[in-house]
Every structure is written in C-alpha cells, then in structure tokens.
Amino acid sequence: MAIPIRTEKEIVKLREACKLASDVLVMIEPYVKAGVTTGELDRICHEYMVNEQKVIPACLNYHGFPKATCISINEVVCHGIPSDDKVLKNGDIVNIDVTVIKDGYFGDNSKMYIVGGETNIRSKKLVEAAQEALYVGIRTVKPDIRLNEIGKAVQKYTESQTFSVVREYCGHGVGTEFHCEPQVLHYYADDGGVILKPGMVFTIEPMINAGKKEVRVMGDGWTVKTKDRSHSAQYEHQLIVTETGCEVMTIRDEEIAEGRISRIMVNV
C-alpha cells in the first residue's frame, strides 16, 4: 500500500486543521447537558466551524451523511446522526466526532462527555478505559515498528479492563483526504507488513464496548450500535510519526495539563 509521507509544508497545514478540530470539542463542552438535543449541539458546532473558524465541516454530505458532526450516545458505537428528537439526559455518555477541512487539509478527532458529570460505575470505567486505550496506542507509535503493534497494545489493554474492541471500524490515514492508507486496526491482526516511518499521518480511535464486541448498523445506514445494547465509548486523536515517536496534533490543553500524554511523544 502507498502510505503518504507528509512534507514539512503539509505538516504545518495539518497542524492548523487539527488545532481547529480540537478547538471545536473544547467549545462545545459547556453545551453538553441534560435537556439539550444532539441536533442543537450539531448546529452549534456547525455554526462555529463555518462562521468563526471559516472551515468546512468534513462530515457534512460525506457519502451522504446529513450533519456536520457525528454524535453517539450510550449504546451507539459511532456515526450517530444528530437529531432534534434525541434529548440528552443526566448519566448519558456521549461521543462527539469532529473533522474540519482547512485549506484542503483535514483535522479529525473525537472525545467523550458524561452528561451531568456522573454515570454508573461500569460506564464511567468504560469512558476512562477508552481514553487510556487511545493513549496506550499513542505511546506505542515510533518509527520502524510494525503498524499492528498499535492494535496489539490497544487490544491487550482493553481486554485487561474487561472490555471488548470493535473490529469493524478503525483508524485511518488522513491528510488532503478524509480517509487514506494506512488502516489502523485496534486489535492484533495482519497489517501487510507495514512499517511506520516519520511523516506518516493517521488517526488512532479505538471503539470499546462494555459488553461483547459485535455491532449492527441501523436502518438509517449510518448509526452503529452494540448488538447486546451495552454502552460503547471512543476517543480519537490525529498524529504524525516523528523520528523519536509521534506528535499528537489534536491534543487539547486539558490533556497536556493532566500529563498522561504530551504533544511531542518520545517513545524510543
């Protein structure tokens, strides 16, 4: 497979797009509260992206997707379509996935929110484990290792926490296209011999379930739910492989303050 190696000029553009994408997730947080609809959250994000940031919402009309963001609640694994009929309630766990296009370059990220700040013990642990699963993947990235080392590490951690890794959806290359090579699986499998090299840009975005790994696509052709109706959680970052590890291009200030990952990860 032909995996693009980004030039310094491209990297500058990607950093800009990624910062804008991460800013949307920070901006929307105060609005994620009981009584608000996912349709309203999407409109706030959409207007902020278009009017304030002057960027293009990448999800809107992508293969026919009707909204600017994906918003997935509780047992929805991914690709939840925002709707004025979906009202948030305290205890819901919510993923908001935002991708922006700035000057032809894509920035892609997502994070979890807990409505009201509290949920049941199992779902709280799930959300925490989803973030740590992403971080485990990020800490694995360095040049000259096999791509599938990422999935191996993510799967090992996730299953150690008594959760399961969704198989049907994966991380992906991203740059001047929304999705390109490589496919970044979050479980251990054949990777075709791909070796990570500096300048490769991709997302890591494990979706993990409180119950079994199996999922189903709903009648709208987009919304993916767990088959057993257990809750699901996901965090996503976009990163670039460096000479000594990776740069997390969509990192948020809150994460830097926590200290579990940094913008520049030295993993060698």
Swiss-Prot record:
InterPro entries: Creatinase/aminopeptidase-like (IPR036005), Pept_M24 (IPR000994), Pept_M24_MAP (IPR001714), Pept_M24A_MAP1 (IPR002467). Its EC number is 3.4.11.18. CDD domains: MetAP1. It is an enzyme of class 3 (hydrolase). Signal peptide: none annotated. Binds 2 divalent metal cations per subunit. Has a high-affinity and a low affinity metal-binding site. The true nature of the physiological cofactor is under debate. The enzyme is active with cobalt, zinc, manganese or divalent iron ions. Most likely, methionine aminopeptidases function as mononuclear Fe(2+)-metalloproteases under physiological conditions, and the catalytically relevant metal-binding site has been assigned to the histidine-containing high-affinity site. It catalyses: Release of N-terminal amino acids, preferentially methionine, from peptides and arylamides. GO terms for molecular function: initiator methionyl aminopeptidase activity; metal ion binding; metalloaminopeptidase activity. Its cofactor is Co(2+); Zn(2+); Mn(2+); Fe(2+). GO terms for cellular component: cytosol. Pfam families: Peptidase_M24. Substrate binds at H79, H179. Removes the N-terminal methionine from nascent proteins. The N-terminal methionine is often cleaved when the second residue in the primary sequence is small and uncharged (Met-Ala-, Cys, Gly, Pro, Ser, Thr, or Val). Requires deformylation of the N(alpha)-formylated initiator methionine before it can be hydrolyzed. This is Methionine aminopeptidase. It comes from Haemophilus influenzae (strain ATCC 51907 / DSM 11121 / KW20 / Rd).
